[in-house]
Structures are given as C-alpha cells and as structure tokens.
Amino acid sequence: MVTLAELLVLLAALLATVSGYFVSIDAHAEECFFERVTSGTKMGLIFEVAEGGFLDIDVEITGPDNKGIYKGDRESSGKYTFAAHMDGTYKFCFSNRMSTMTPKIVMFTIDIGEAPKGQDMETEAHQNKLEEMINELAVAMTAVKHEQEYMEVRERIHRAINDNTNSRVVLWSFFEALVLVAMTLGQIYYLKRFFEVRRVV
C-alpha cells in the first residue's frame, strides 16, 4: 500500500519536470536550450511570442544525431509533442534572424515525461491504480498551469492593443474637436464680414 507521503513526493517529482521560461531574443539572434533524455521518453514544447514585432518566431527542434524533428517559420504560438528516438541531448531553438531590429519575448515550456520502464520493472497491467490516477492528475494540473500562463500572456497582448487603440481614439477625438472649433470660428468670422457695412468716403 502506498502512503500519503509517498504520493505527495511522487506528485512533486512529476510536477518538477515542467519548467516555464520567458526569454528575450534580439534581432538577428538565436537562442537554444538543451534537454538530455533517454530513448522513448515523451517530450513536448509549448511556446508563445509575448512581445515584439509581428509576434512571430522561427522554431526548430533537433535530435542528438542532428536530425530535424520539427521546424516552424514565423509562428506566433505552438505545441509540439514527440517521443525521443534515441538517447542523447535534444536541442530546442528559437530564431529571430528574420527580424531587422525588433527583439522578441518568447514564453515557452519544455515538458519531459517519464522515461519508459525497462523489462525488469513491473508492467502497466500490474501498476497501482492510485499511481495511475496521480499521474493523470499531474498531467492535468500541468496542462491547466500552461493554459493559465498562456492566457496571461494573451491578456497582456490584448490589453496593450486595447490601450493603443484607446489612445488613438482619444487623440483622433481631440483632433476632431480642434477642427470643429476652428471651423466654427472661421464661420463666425466669415458671417461677421459678410454682414459688415462698408462705408465709402
């Protein structure tokens, strides 16, 4: 029987394998991150461009044998999951080389799943049902955490767009008010001159 303390330690270990980061990538620059895993381990990359330019970035995932696993150009956000095809270090790169002057801020998470169990370990059919439920709960909690982080990023982006639009509307309204006042003063001056009696001496 598994005790509550063991379950909490297992849950903490499962949640510890997920890390969310913000990274700033300058124009004409590339940032790479590395994860060493064993063959068969499930990995995932979730990313979203939070700030900068057209909110796009180039993404590339490369295996230990320099084999391209995933390549995406000018993506704003994405989610990619795969199983490691061999033991070694996997490379996750974000490139801002297409940008001429705007740095980008990228929020990303690299998920590393459990390593596959060997022949000497007990099979899935004999696993404890409670352990399976905890694994499912950990995965669900991680997914909720990711969604909350990405919703915060999206909310920040939309708030910036709303603030920008609001300031433009206020400036345009102020400009229209000035034009209206100028036209009113011009019409008053014109009508006053129209009804003026000119005396000839």
UniProtKB/Swiss-Prot annotation:
Residues 117-167 form a coiled coil. Its main location: membrane. Residues 118-157 are annotated as: Required for TMED10 and TMED2 cis-Golgi network localization. It is found in: Cytoplasmic vesicle membrane; Cytoplasmic vesicle, COPI-coated vesicle membrane; Golgi apparatus, cis-Golgi network membrane; Golgi apparatus, Golgi stack membrane. PANTHER family: TRANSMEMBRANE EMP24 DOMAIN-CONTAINING PROTEIN. Belongs to the EMP24/GP25L family. It comes from the Eukaryota. It is a single-pass type I membrane protein. Residues 1-20 form the signal peptide. This is Transmembrane emp24 domain-containing protein 2. Disulfide bonds: none annotated. It comes from Homo sapiens. Monomer and homodimer in the endoplasmic reticulum, endoplasmic reticulum-Golgi intermediate compartment and Golgi. Probably oligomerizes with other members of the EMP24/GP25L family such as TMED7, TMED9 and TMED10. Interacts (via GOLD domain) with TMED10 (via GOLD domain). Associates with the COPI vesicle coat (coatomer); TMED10:TMED2 heterotetramers are proposed to be involved in coatomer association. Interacts (via C-terminus) with COPG1; the interaction involves dimeric TMED2. Interacts with SEC23A; indicative for an association of TMED2 with the COPII vesicle coat. Involved in vesicular protein trafficking. Mainly functions in the early secretory pathway but also in post-Golgi membranes. Thought to act as cargo receptor at the lumenal side for incorporation of secretory cargo molecules into transport vesicles and to be involved in vesicle coat formation at the cytoplasmic side. The gene is TMED2.
